[in-house]
C-alpha cells in the first residue's frame, strides 16, 4: 500500500512541476501490479542466419514456429557495447536490404506467445527491449518496431487488416522521418477519438498513429523502449491504456482506447514486427543496406484489465 501511494504521489508531483516521469521497467510493472514476468533468452555466441532461425523457433515461444523473412535476421556481436554486464552477449540483428520497403523487402515479423500456466488470459502487459540502429542509418519516411498483440486472430491487425473488436489488436512502435517516434495501433476508433489531435486515424483499414513525434530515436546507440498495454474494461467502454517510455522517460500515455468489444480478445504476447521501411511505394525505400539490433527483451503481465 505504501509503495503504491508513493508512486501515485511521485506522478502527481511530476505533473505539477512539469517534470518528465522517469521509471525503470520493473518499477512501472510493480506500479501496475504486473507480477508475472519472463525474458526471452539469447545465445552465448553469434549464430548464422540458419542457426538463428533454429534457435528462435526452439527457444522462443513463436506462434506456429513461423518467422516472416527469417533470412534477414541473425545473432551477431554487439556493435555498441555499453559496458553493461551483458554487453558481451550477442544481439539480434535485423537487415534491411538496399531498396527495400514494406513487407517482403527487409526486416522480420513473428509473435512470441506468452502463456505461463497454459490457460492465462493476460489483460495487461508490459514489454521492454533495447533497440539500436547503424550509425549511418537513414530513417527515410518510417518503419515499424516491436510491441504487443492480442486476440484470437494471430495474423490480423497488420498490413491493412483492420481490427473489429473481436478479432485482434496490435500496438507497435514506429519511427518516422528523422527518427521521430510514435505508437502505431490497430484497435477500434470510437466516435470523436479521431478528432483528438493526438491521434491520426486512417479510414482504409490501416492503424492509428498516437502522439507522433513525442520522442526521437538516436542512431549509433542503444535506445530503451518500454510499452504498457491495458485492455478496456467493461468491453463497451473506451478506457484502455497505452503508455510508451523512451529511455525510461514517459513519452506517451493515453487511456481513452477501446481495444475490444468481445472477451475473446486478450493479450497474446510480444509482437516482433520490425518492418522494412513500412510504406506503400519506393519513396520509403532505404538507399543502402542498414540494420537494427535488439537485446534485453522482457515482459510482465497481469489478468487484470484497466
Describe the role of every protein-language-model region.
Residues 1-23:
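Fungal secretory targeting signals
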Residues 17-223, 227-306:
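Low-complexity, Ser/Thr/Pro/Gly-rich disordered linker/stalk regions
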Amino acid at each position: 500500500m505504501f509503495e503504491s501511494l508513493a508512486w501515485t504521489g511521485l506522478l502527481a508531483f511530476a505533473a505539477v512541476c512539469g517534470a518528465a516521469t522517469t521509471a525503470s521497467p520493473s518499477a512501472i510493472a510493480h506500479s501496475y501490479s504486473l507480477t508475472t514476468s519472463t525474458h526471452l533468452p539469447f545465445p552465448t555466441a553469434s549464430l548464422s542466419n540458419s542457426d538463428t532461425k533454429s534457435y528462435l523457433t526452439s527457444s522462443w515461444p513463436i506462434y506456429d514456429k513461423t518467422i516472416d523473412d527469417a533470412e534477414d535476421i541473425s545473432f551477431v556481436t554487439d556493435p555498441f557495447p555499453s559496458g553493461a554486464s551483458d554487453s558481451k552477449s550477442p544481439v539480434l540483428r535485423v537487415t534491411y536490404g538496399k531498396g527495400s520497403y514494406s513487407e517482403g523487402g527487409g526486416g522480420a515479423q513473428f509473435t512470441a506467445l506468452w502463456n505461463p500456466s497454459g490457460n492465462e488470459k493476460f489483460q495487461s502487459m508490459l514489454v521492454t527491449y533495447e533497440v539500436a540502429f547503424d550509425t549511418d542509418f537513414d530513417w527515410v519516411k518510417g518503419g515499424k518496431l516491436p510491441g504487443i498483440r492480442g486476440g484470437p486472430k494471430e495474423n490480423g491487425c497488420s498490413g491493412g487488416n483492420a481490427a473489429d473488436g473481436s478479432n485482434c489488436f496490435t500496438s507497435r512502435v514506429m519511427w518516422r522521418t528523422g527518427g521521430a517516434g510514435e505508437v502505431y495501433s490497430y484497435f477500434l476508433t470510437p466516435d470523436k477519438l479521431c478528432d483528438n489531435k493526438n491521434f491520426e486515424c486512417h479510414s482504409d483499414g490501416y492503424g492509428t498513429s498516437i502522439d507522433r513525434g513525442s520522442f526521437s530515436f538516436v542512431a549509433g546507440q542503444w535506445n530503451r523502449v518500454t510499452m504498457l498495454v491495458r485492455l478496456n474494461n467493461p468491453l463497451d467502454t473506451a478506457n484502455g491504456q497505452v503508455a510508451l517510455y523512451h529511455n525510461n522517460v514517459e513519452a506517451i500515455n493515453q487511456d481513452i482506447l477501446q481495444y475490444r468489444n468481445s472477451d475473446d480478445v486478450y493479450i497474446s504476447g510480444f509482437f516482433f514486427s520490425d518492418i522494412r521501411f513500412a510504406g506503400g511505394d519506393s519513396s520509403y525505400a532505404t538507399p543502402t543496406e542498414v540494420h537494427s539490433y535488439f537485446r534485453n527483451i522482457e515482459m510482465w503481465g497481469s489478468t487484470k484489465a484497466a
